[in-house]
Amino acid sequence: MLFACLRALHYEPKRMRITVISGDPRRTEKTLRVHAVSRFDGYSVLKRVYQSDLLSSGGGSLLQDVTSWKSMMYYLSIIGMGIFFRKKVFLYSQGIGPVRYHWGRWILRTVMNHVDAITVRDSESKFFLEQLGVKNRIYYTADAVLSLSPVPHDIGREILRKNHIPTNKKLIGISIRRWMNTEV
């Protein structure tokens, strides 16, 4: 997801300085050639938000409380820091909701009404925010992952060959991930 977001920004390490909040900063820096701070280092996160010109949150489904209300509050607190420090705050390709708790919906609405731009990746998220009473304009966009270019055909065919997948018929690839209470 982060790779897709960087590609959408046309990220060039020599032209831009991007700092990422990461669970594994060293790996993130090495893999994606960005600066990274640990999500568990509150001081570094606060410092980087303060030093930034723009705070971008997303993509993914960060603003929901089904996984944990604590997770949603963590991400809202980072967005809140950006608002407090008067930075431009942009929600990029977010999946938002569900939010089960009334107080969580109130906090989410309050924060969303103070960001500079909101883009969501599905109609349910847009509808949820509108029903919540978010007054900011909400833009509907594709999931950031859809902005990635496919691998060249010869590399794709080699991957299929190595995995003994026939190439003489039409194929579709689907990446499945467990989500909320679904069974896969």
Question: What would you call each of these model-derived segments?
Answer:
Residues 1-184:
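Active-site anion-handling motifs in enzyme catalytic cores
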